[in-house]
Every structure is written in C-alpha cells, then in structure tokens.
Amino acid sequence: MNDREPNQKESKESVNDAVPRARKVDDQQLRVSKIRDGTVIDHLTAGEALNVLAILGIDGSSGEGVSVGMNVISDRLGRKDIVKVEDRELSQSEVDVLAVIAPEATINIIRDYAVVDKKRIERPTAVTGLLFCPNRNCITNANEPINTRFIVLDEGLQCDYCGSIVRESEVPTYLDVA
C-alpha cells in the first residue's frame, strides 16, 4: 500500500539514494579550500581558532571570507586548528598579538593561490603597547604618555614598570589592540 508511512530504514535509504554521495576525503585532499589572496594562520593549538579570531577582531563583518578548520590532524602537533582569511594580510601588531597567544603558529601570505611568504611566529622577549597592566596603580594606567611594556615569561607576561604578572590564560582579557 502506498498510504503507509515508510519505516526509518526505508526513509534513510530513499534519502541516501536521492542525495549525491560526497567524495571520500583522503589524506591528500584539502578539507578547507584554497584562497586566492589573504592570510593563512596555521599550526594553532587545537581548539584555539575561534579565540584567535575573536582576539584579532576577525568576524567577517569587514567583508573578508573566513574559513576555519578545527581539530585537524597534524604531523607536528597531533591535532591543530587552521584559519584562512581572504583578502586581508595581518598587520604587524596583529602578528605581535599572535606571537603572544599562539607562539607555535605559522603565517602564510597568499597571492593568486600561491604562498609568497611563510613565517613561523617566534615568541618575543618583550611586547610594547599590546596589553593593559592589571595593576590599577601602575604608571601605565595613569594619565601619563607611557606605553605598557611586558617581559615575556614561560608562564605569562610581567609588566616592566610595576612587576604585575599576566598569566597566559589572562592575556585575552588585557589585550589593547586597535
């Protein structure tokens, strides 16, 4: 009879028959498509891609296309995240922020589908003007024309003026990126 409702098994089979099957993704195939021009931020710690986008203020509202691959298999890291931002190259201050929050990252500049510049970010010894000091009494928080300066430590950053510590997990809270 045609008036009866199909059972779940029949329903799945008919849906599967109607939808073209996707090609199997093998180890050599890209999971995220190539971009013509822009920046690829590779080798991010797994689970950090969305934090990196938020910290850098990249949300696609400026018109750039943004692709994110999360928890992708990596020979070097085991698992990693990757971010592709079309039609935009990171400024030096954005690269400096990345160096603090994602020191293992690699930045690739893409032009006409080719990598024209590839650099591995290295953690700096100090950063200037990127963070607010958490100490309200620090000279950098007064109405003085002084840029903050933090010494980069293994566990975070230390204010060069008052000695306050910003732990690595707290860095996003104190970022001062325009």
Swiss-Prot record:
Quaternary structure annotation from Swiss-Prot or TrEMBL: Contains catalytic and regulatory chains.
Binding residues for Zn(2+): 133, 138, 159, 162
Bias type Basic and acidic residues, positions: 1-15
Cofactor(s) required for function per UniProt: Zn(2+)
GO terms assigned for molecular function: metal ion binding
Function summary: Involved in allosteric regulation of aspartate carbamoyltransferase.
Annotated spans, Disordered: 1-23
Gene behind the chain: pyrI
Family: Belongs to the PyrI family.
Cofactor: how and how many bound: Binds 1 zinc ion per subunit.
Any one of the GO BP annotations: 'de novo' pyrimidine nucleobase biosynthetic process
NCBIfam families: ATCase_reg
InterPro entries from the UniProt entry: Asp_carbamoyltransf_reg_N, Asp_carbamoylTrfase_reg, Asp_carbamoyltrfase_reg_C, Asp_carbatrfase_reg_C_sf, Asp_carbatrfase_reg_N_sf
GO cellular component: aspartate carbamoyltransferase complex
Protein name: Aspartate carbamoyltransferase regulatory chain
Superkingdom of the organism of origin: Archaea
Keywords: Metal-binding, Pyrimidine biosynthesis, Zinc
HAMAP family linked to this entry: Asp_carb_tr_reg (MF_00002)
Signal peptide per UniProt: none
